[in-house]
Amino acid sequence: MMILNAVFERFAKRTPITVMTRALLEHALGAEALNSLFQQHAQQQYTNKLLFSTMVDVMALVVCRMQPSVNAAYTQMKKEVGATVSALYAKLDGIEDDVTAGLVRHVGSRLGPVVEAVGGQLPPLVPGYRTKIIDGKHLNATEHRLAVLRDVKAAPLPGQALVVLDPSLMLAIDMFPCQDGHAQERSLFTQVLGSVETNDLWIADRNFCTVSFLSGIADRPAFFCIRQHANFPVASFGELRSHGRCRTGEVFEQEVTFLGELGTLITMRRIVVRLDRPTKNGDTEIGIFTNVPAQDADAVRIAELYLERWTIEGVFQVLTETLDGEQPSLGYPNAALFGFAIALVSYNVAAVLRAALRATFGHDRVEKEVSWYYIANESRFNYGGMDVAIDEEVWNPFRTMSAVEMAEKLKQYAANVDLSSFKRRRRGPKIPQPPRTKYADQPHVSTARLLLLAGRLT
């Protein structure tokens, strides 16, 4: 055991990012907890020989780019899977939406206290409220592998999901999957309203601006900051008054009313921003509905608050750049949505790691200088070797640690991180591409000869 501890300590000093990643995975995705979650949420599938925790492990190898495909991941884990590759795919294709959503919620609730204990949370956007940002994500089209798709020319969409981000913890805390890629987002609003808690503050784009959604939030009672949809039925408008400026333009406010679901007249604030520059759709002003009291957030603060909606777009960008959560080979909606959920879970692990770095090195330094890509690449490069060198039993204690104990370990390992190894490289402005008119009559050219003609090759 002393030898094992010595090997572990060597990894903790030389590649602390990889050790922190594995420790967080053990804490958030312990096999016993995952299999219990499956039993709790599954209605049609049953465990048999193939455990849900094993499914998570297999898919994580693919999503985290440690293996190029599910089949390759199966080959690596064939002994642990204990079933045929056909059985693996069959179970993937049948994973139920409740199980997929439950996985994201479980990991969010497991890691949130760790972020708080490590001291890496961001300041609340509005003190006294728990802010939640919600947005939709349509999964990319898949390959035409399924029999029903082989003679279809149109791109096959495997589904979509609404994702909820806690911007203070920077964790994806909820997911509402939908297998129908053509369904309207509002078809999921009833499920979302079921998750609204007292004193929540929901930020969303205009697709979420419906009578049922706004009145449903207000009835909890909770709060919203949602962009006005052009078709929203406003019953009355008060006087529009100037309230100064925000980053994007002049700010105005007025009182408005609308009829709720039960015919009750509901009063709220309408914040108007007359933009300095039109949006890409040509809008010169935007309206924002909110029921947050003015003493808690004035008109300018609400206008700035709505801009925080782009934080979740940044999360989706991180998923695209560092993970493969949308596998083109997974045509069945159940499997595709499960893969996307694994990407959210993996992002959450990285977000806690980043919170530990913020607590150790300071918010500004980490957020401005540290690259998500290089952090992910460090774990990918060292993970396999560490897995071979360190026995499973060494990681077991992380599964049962409290949030406080886990936070102490993370800070201990974070102190060994050399941030300069993960420094973000900012590229300069893009150079406009000149018209490609030379050698248009030839199928190809010799790069070496062109460099020689330009004096760039000797």
Model-inferred region functions:
Residues 1-70, 80-95, 102-110, 114, ...:
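Single, function-defining residue in the core of a domain
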Residues 71-75:
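Residues within the helices of the helix-turn-helix
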